[in-house]
Amino acid sequence: MKILFVLISILHAVYCFSSEEDVDSAYLANELEPVEDINSEQYAALEPKEEHERSCADMGQDCKDDCDCCLNIATCNCWFGRYFCSCTFGDYQTCLRKKGKCKRNRPQSCPRSNLNRKKG
């Protein structure tokens, strides 16, 4: 099965390379006209600026401690002690802990679950 996969991969690579040469040779022989982008100047101002690093990490992104995670209830969960850390969902206690120790990305309010409240 592995050999079959390798053979198919090689055939696909050869096909892609040969079809690329056909397009290049046709272009050099003036059989294909180059496509001119009429609106290139119009969209020049709309190109995105370089992205700055965010001050907090979204769910699933790498983190070092709870204060790196964006959400109020997000916690930094690490495998094998301090390795392979990423932001995951926490709970109300996580929010309170972040409120006490974090100077940046400090939660303004901690959401409480409506499941435990008594009605009536």
From Swiss-Prot:
What keywords sit in the KW lines? Answer: Disulfide bond, Knottin, Secreted, Signal, Toxin
The intrachain disulfides are 56-70, 63-76, 69-87, 78-85
Q: Where is the Agouti domain?
A: 56-95
Q: Taxonomically, which superkingdom?
A: Eukaryota
Q: Which GO terms describe its cellular component?
A: extracellular region
> How would you describe the post-translational modification of this protein?
Contains 6 disulfide bonds.
Cleavable signal peptide:
1-16
Subcellular location field: Secreted
The main location is secreted
Q: Which residues form the propeptide?
A: 17-54
Tissue specificity, please? Expressed by the venom gland.
* Keyword Repeat carried by entry: no
The Swiss-Prot or TrEMBL record annotates one GO molecular function as: toxin activity
Q: Which family does it belong to?
A: Belongs to the neurotoxin 05 (agouti) family.
Domain comment text?
A: The presence of a 'disulfide through disulfide kOR' structurally defines this protein as a knottin.
Q: What is this protein called?
A: U13-lycotoxin-Ls1a
| Upper classification of the organism | Eukaryota, Metazoa, Ecdysozoa, Arthropoda, Chelicerata
